[in-house]
A protein has these predicted regions:
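Histidine/acidic residue-rich metal-binding segments in metalloenzymes
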Residues: 1-119
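His/Asp/Glu-enriched, well-ordered alpha-helical/loop segment
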Residues: 18-44, 113-119, 124-195
Length: 196
């Protein structure tokens, strides 16, 4: 929600990445999500909402399933504030931001209860020289394509989700949602795409 972002911009503290989730607030996230759902429902269209990070969005979206699907990222299932900013500084800066543990816990609730439809990488890498810049001049984002599977397999090994859930979230559900033919499964007649 650009209006909320512009209003909150004054809350940014130069050099303090901890203010990133204050600027890009929960209110900003849920406002944008509500707007997308409202438009999709008004025009009876499908919408796939990326990078869900708040408990408010999880609660709202779980009541608007059907034509609405949504994604959570491995980053938001692995790191939470303020620990991530204390340990990683601007390397933990991304959009939407990493939030406190109550949001992290609700994201995992969504995964455990099959509320989210996909897990996506939000691949947005930057050069170290840029990530080392003082906040807010540091860019938001981190690598994701090459880390999605190893990070999520760690979560599988930790018992946070099953291997079958992970396969559904990263292989099977995306091809169903986007109508991609001959992908997402190991079946006769399908493309032989494998991760080893």
């Amino acid at each position: 929600d650009e209006a909320i972002l512009n209003t909150n911009k004054k809350l940014i503290k130069k050099g303090d990445v901890h203010t990133h989730p204050v600027w890009r607030s929960v209110e900003c996230a849920i406002s944008s999500t509500r707007r997308i759902v409202k438009i999709a429902e008004r025009y009876k269209k499908k919408a796939h909402i990326l990078h869900i990070t708040t408990k408010e969005e999880i609660d709202f979206l779980s009541q608007h399933k059907g034509n609405i699907t949504f994604e959570i990222t491995p980053q938001h299932l692995t790191l939470f504030a303020p620990d991530c900013y204390n340990k990683l500084g601007t390397y933990a800066q991304m959009n939407p931001p990493l939030r406190d543990k109550s949001h992290y816990d609700r994201l995992w609730y969504a995964v455990r209860n099959n509320l989210n439809d996909t897990i996506g990488s939000d691949h947005a890498p930057h050069l170290k020289v840029n990530k080392d810049k003082e906040y807010p001049n540091s860019p938001s984002g981190m690598p994701g394509v090459q880390t999605l599977i190893p990070v999520m397999l760690n979560h599988v090994n930790d018992g946070k989700l099953t291997l079958n859930q992970l396969i559904n979230l990263v292989c099977e559900n995306p091809v169903k949602i986007f109508g991609i033919k001959n992908k997402g499964y190991i079946k006769e007649g399908f493309d032989a795409d494998f991760t080893i």
